[in-house]
């Protein structure tokens, strides 16, 4: 199982830790989409920035 992650809000005014989490996920700008494996580490980063992103489950790796 993989996760499709799309950034929907910008990083202006957010905490540095949230910006670091977005960078670690590979997100750089609004409407940028990446596909990441469904691991506990990725889920933790998603939880921290859930107000800035949208997550969808996709089949495959």
Swiss-Prot record:
One of its GO terms (cellular component) is cytosolic large ribosomal subunit. GO terms for molecular function: structural constituent of ribosome. Pfam families: Ribosomal_L30. This is Large ribosomal subunit protein uL30. Belongs to the universal ribosomal protein uL30 family. The gene is rpmD. InterPro entries: Ribo_uL30_ferredoxin-like_sf, Ribosomal_uL30_bac-type, Ribosomal_uL30_ferredoxin-like. The keyword Glycosyltransferase does not apply. One of its GO terms (biological process) is translation. Gene3D superfamilies: Ribosomal protein L30, ferredoxin-like fold domain. The keyword Ribosomal protein applies. Part of the 50S ribosomal subunit. Keywords: Ribonucleoprotein, Ribosomal protein.
